[in-house]
UniProtKB/Swiss-Prot annotation:
The LCN-type CS-alpha/beta domain, residue ranges: 1-66
Stated family: Belongs to the long (4 C-C) scorpion toxin superfamily. Sodium channel inhibitor family. Beta subfamily.
Chief subcellular location: secreted
Lineage, opening ranks: Eukaryota, Metazoa, Ecdysozoa, Arthropoda, Chelicerata
UniProt xrefs under InterPro entries: LCN-type_CS_alpha_beta_dom, Scorpion_toxin-like, Scorpion_toxin-like_sf, Scorpion_toxinL, Scorpion_toxinL/defensin
Protein name stated in the entry: Beta-toxin Chui3
Key word Disulfide bond present: yes
Localization: Secreted
Keyword Disulfide bond part of the UniProt annotation: yes
A Pfam match: Toxin_3
First and last residue of the signal peptide: none
SS bond partners: C12-C65, C16-C41, C25-C46, C29-C48
Keyword entries, A-Z: Disulfide bond, Ion channel impairing toxin, Neurotoxin, Secreted, Toxin, Voltage-gated sodium channel impairing toxin
Length: 66
């Protein structure tokens, strides 16, 4: 599974500005989803890869980013 890293409290994607390989996104994806996860910056949001199927990613139901 893959998807955008989401702030569970707000429903917002984690923003990033250095597209492609991005240490911040990689670190945050691993912190949320475990050391097997990957991550990079895609369309100014942290995109996480190699996730387990039940991983929660953006968009969240009933939560819109404001």
């Amino acid at each position: 599974k893959e998807g955008y890293l989401v702030e569970l409290g707000t429903g917002c994607k984690y923003e990033c500005f250095k597209l492609g390989d991005n240490d911040y996104c990689l670190r945050e994806c691993k912190a949320r989803y475990g050391k097997g996860a990957g991550g990079y910056c895609y369309a100014f949001g942290c995109w996480c890869t190699q996730l387990y199927e039940q991983a929660v990613v953006w968009p969240l139901k009933n939560k819109t980013c404001r």
